[in-house]
Regions:
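Serine-hydrolase catalytic core recognition
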Residues: 276-279, 325, 333-335, 353, ...
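Structural signature of eukaryotic scaffold interfaces centered on beta-propeller domains
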Residues: 50-52, 127-128, 174-175, 264, ...
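Hydrophobic beta-strand positions that form the internal "hydrophobic ladder"
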Residues: 58, 131-135, 178-182, 267-270, ...
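Multi-bladed beta-propeller domains
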Residues: 24-45, 102-122, 149-168, 198-199, ...
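Bacterial N-terminal signal peptides
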Residues: 10-20
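Asp-box/WD-like beta-propeller blade repeats and closely related beta-sheet repeat scaffolds
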Residues: 116-124, 141-227, 313, 324-325
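Predominantly five- to eight-bladed beta-propeller fold
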Residues: 64-101, 186-241, 276, 280-360, ...
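Bacterial N-terminal signal peptides that target proteins for export
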Residues: 1-11
């Protein structure tokens, strides 16, 4: 039996507890981890870099150690598969550049860029085609602004008072004359944002009267009701305009949900893709209906190339594709030619077909019928354009992991010969990627040397000894591949840019377990000393001495496994066993041979990221990092 006195005692205790909780909540602030971990979180990361194509100027990109609490506290809307910030019309989750420096190579003085906004949050850095300027987006709490920097004076200037709309990405792109940019802007007459309404006005209806059956993946952050639709339309609607460096502004069409807006290589046309209704509650925005239009640079509509339907029934497979025209792109080595792909198997990998994808091309003035230029036995993944007689086409088929690379001659009805036919899982057999360079329009094309050689660059360079990046040369006539250079122990060196392919001059990063990656100029043909162009210090010298070993061992079924073992500073085997963290995630493979290939390098810098597994080595633990856990599915049953 509960007496009156006991009830009073319970009430007093409850009030005391409530008061103590309230005091604790009032006094509570964000806590800090142990100092060893806090030092890793707060140290500025090594800057990134961006180079001109000639390698004469380096842009150094400073980054913050972590986003601020103010950045993390920004609002977020999840609509149609997007996560956007309604306050500034950009992505809600982004990493930013916080400072810019310019350096003339190889030995110029670093100059800090002037004219940046206070506490800058910079993204989307993009060189002009003539490389005398670069543009970038600067985010604030309530808008995203477009800046252009003059390289000669290292001065940034805001180009327009209009705010960018970056909710769907691709907020701006230079035209080929380097005198203007095509940008997606917040419309002038945009109304107040519609308030979210969680109260339904009626049931959500879904119609499958066609009786079609099919699997569908589970997508995140889809539209759920008419209120979501209104917010989606409001925040993704843009006005495309050409912004001149002289202050001029030329709009294109009406405001709409602009997915992409890209100028032609010659700068005379602009291709715009506009998302429109009907929307879907089953698939994200990239499956919504989209209309593809071409405008003149003066803003007049030339032609609607396609108006694609809602794609709710794309076969559930990595080899599935939309059934109609898709992937409209400009041909990089032509003045104004559009190419696109159509799945002849209706996008269904279960349908047997000798030709699965057909590529079509349409040249300006876009009045003729599209011309079929390439047939792909598998899914077409793209061209690397070169010139009027040379291009490289790629195909892939996920079910078998097949990747095919073909040499194509655009001048002879796109006659094709196979260069490589390999498995995407075969890291050892990866020949590397063809070297490219910007052409006169500022578009990337194959860097073809006078003797029909091209460089092949592999920044990973997997081998039985671990990763060893390399550079080789392939002759496009004989198909012969000649190795030029490969990273050698005890250093990990990675090619990151070709400065002069004919002379064999490249830029690399070099690192060791205790030496931070820095940038060097290497001549592959002359045995001359490397030229060091950066001297980034060790970000956490207090952690020098953490040891790293590359381990190889066998699983019970005979599959070779790899892992990287980190041991604390000063640890000796005589100290006995250590508590150990295993940091791993399983991966799928089609064969035991591919699953057993080595990965990683014992000579890479000991980068102790605060969010990674290796950080526990700073606290006295052993860490088995990136331990391979292959799931091998051989045969047809492994397909989906």
């Amino acid at each position: 039996m509960i007496t009156r006195s006991s009830r009073l005692l319970c009430l007093s205790a409850l009030l005391a507890l409530t008061a103590s909780v309230a005091v604790a909540q009032d006094a509570l602030s964000y806590q800090t981890p142990p100092k060893a971990l806090a030092d890793l979180v707060t140290v500025p990361p090594t800057p990134g870099v961006s180079l001109t194509s000639k390698g004469d100027v380096m842009l150094i990109l400073e980054r913050a150690s972590a986003p601020s609490i103010a950045e993390l506290a920004q609002p977020e809307l999840k609509l149609a598969g997007l996560r956007l910030n309604p306050a500034n019309n950009g992505p809600s989750r982004a990493s930013y550049i916080t400072g810019l420096r310019l350096k003339k190579l190889p030995n110029g003085t670093e100059i800090r860029v002037k004219g940046l906004p206070d506490n800058p949050l910079i993204s989307l850095v993009q060189w002009s085609p003539d490389e005398t300027k670069f543009a970038f987006a600067a985010s604030t709490q309530n808008r995203i602004e477009l800046y252009v920097t003059d390289v000669a004076t290292a001065t940034a200037t805001r180009l327009t008072n209009r705010a960018l709309n970056a909710t769907l990405g691709g907020a701006f792109q230079w035209t080929s004359d380097s005198k203007s940019l095509i940008a997606k802007l917040i419309p002038d007459a945009r109304a107040t944002a519609p308030a979210a309404n969680a109260v339904p006005t009626g049931p959500t209806m879904q119609d499958n009267s066609s009786g079609k059956r099919g699997q569908a993946p589970t997508y995140q952050d889809l539209l759920k009701n008419p209120s979501d639709e209104k917010q989606f339309v409001h925040f993704t609607t843009s006005q495309v305009a050409r912004l001149g460096l002289d202050g001029s502004e030329q709009p294109f069409g009406q405001p709409g949900i602009i997915a992409t807006a890209s100028p032609s290589p010659d700068g005379q046309f602009v291709m715009i893709e506009t998302v429109h209704t009907p929307f879907s509650y089953l698939v994200p925005v990239y499956r919504f209906p989209v209309r593809t239009d071409v405008f003149t640079i003066g803003g007049q509509l030339v032609k609607t190339l396609n108006d694609g339907p809602l794609q709710e029934s794309v076969p559930y497979s990595p080899d599935g594709a939309p059934s109609g025209p898709r992937d409209f792109e400009w041909r990089n080595d032509a003045l104004a030619s559009v190419y696109y792909t159509v799945a002849l198997d209706k996008g269904d990998p279960k349908v047997k077909a000798e030709v699965r994808d057909r590529v079509f091309m349409l040249e300006a003035p876009f009045t003729a019928e599209p011309k079929a230029i390439y047939d792909a036995a598998f899914r077409f993944t793209g061209f690397i354009w070169g010139n009027g007689t040379t291009a490289i086409a790629s195909e892939r088929w996920w079910q078998t992991r097949k990747v095919i690379t073909k040499l194509v001659n655009p001048s002879t009805n796109f006659a094709a010969t196979v260069l490589f036919d390999r498995s995407s899982e075969d890291r050892y057999g990866n020949p590397g990627s063809p070297d490219t360079k910007p052409n006169q329009y500022g578009r990337e094309v194959l860097n073809i040397l006078p003797n029909n050689d091209i460089m092949l660059v592999n920044g990973q360079g997997s081998s039985p000894e671990g990763d060893r990046p390399f550079v080789s040369v392939m002759n496009l006539i004989t198909k012969k591949i000649t190795p030029l250079w490969r990273s050698e122990a005890p250093v990990f060196e990675r090619p990151i840019a070709t400065l002069d392919a004919a002379a064999g001059v490249i830029m690399t990063t070099r690192e060791t377990p205790d030496e931070n990656p820095n940038y060097f100029i290497r001549n592959l043909k002359k045995r001359i000393a490397l030229i060091q162009v950066t001297s980034f210090p060790h970000p956490y010298p207090q952690l020098k001495g953490i040891t790293k070993q590359q381990l190889r061992y066998k699983r019970a079924d005979g599959v070779d496994l790899t892992a990287t073992l980190y041991l604390p500073v000063g640890y000796k085997k005589s100290d006995g066993p250590l508590p150990t963290f295993v940091w791993a995630y399983p991966a799928e493979f089609k064969s035991k041979e591919a699953a057993g290939q080595a990965q990683g390098s014992p000579y890479q810098f000991n980068r102790i990221a605060a969010m990674g597994g290796a950080v526990f080595a700073t606290m006295g633990y052993a860490v088995l990092d990136n331990a391979s856990i292959p799931i091998v599915g051989e045969g047809q049953r492994a397909e989906r």
